[in-house]
Amino acid sequence: MCQTMRCILVACVALALLAAGCRVEASNSRPPRKNDVNTMADAYKFLQDLDTYYGDRARVRFGKRGSLMDILRNHEMDNINLGKNANNGGEFARGFNEEEIF
C-alpha cells in the first residue's frame, strides 16, 4: 500500500514539474515576426523583444572554462617537465642549443 502511494506521489510531482516547465517556456515565447517595421521606433522595439527572448540563451558563460592561454601554458610546462624527467636512455640531458659532446 505504501509503495503504491509513493509511486503515485512521485508521478504527481513529476507531472507538476513538467507542467511548470512548459508554462515557463510558453511565457518566453519568441516575438512574432512582423514585416511592417516601417519606423526606427518599430525596429528598436523589435530588437528589444529579440534581446529579451534570446538574452538568457546567448550570453557568454564566463568562468566555465579556462582561457586558451592557461591551457597552452600548462601544456608547455608539462612538456618541459616531462622532457627533463623522462631521460630513460642513459644520456645526459642537454639544452636546446648545446652541441653534442664526444
UniProtKB/Swiss-Prot annotation:
Tissue: Expressed in midgut, brain lobes and ventral nerve cord of larvae. Predominantly expressed in two pairs of protocerebral neurons in the larval CNS (at protein level). Intense expression is also seen in the fan-shaped body of the central complex and two lateral areas of the lower part of the central brain that appear to harbor the giant commissural interneurons of the giant fiber pathway (at protein level). Upon glucose feeding, two additional dNPFergic neurons are consistently detected on the ventromedial surface of the subesophageal ganglion (SEG) of third instars larvae.
Disulfide bonds: none
Modified residues (Phenylalanine amide): 62
Span of the signal peptide: 1-26
GO molecular function, one term: neuropeptide F receptor binding
Propeptide: 27-32, 66-102
Keyword Membrane recorded: no
Family according to the record: Belongs to the NPY family.
Function as written in the Swiss-Prot or TrEMBL entry: Integral part of the sensory system that mediates food signaling, providing the neural basis for the regulation of food response; coordinates larval foraging and social behavior changes during development. Required in dopaminergic (DA) neurons that innervate the mushroom body for satiety to suppress appetitive memory performance; a key factor in the internal state of hunger in the brain. NPF neurons coordinately modulate diverse sensory and motor neurons important for feeding, flight, and locomotion.
Protein name per Swiss-Prot or TrEMBL: Neuropeptide F
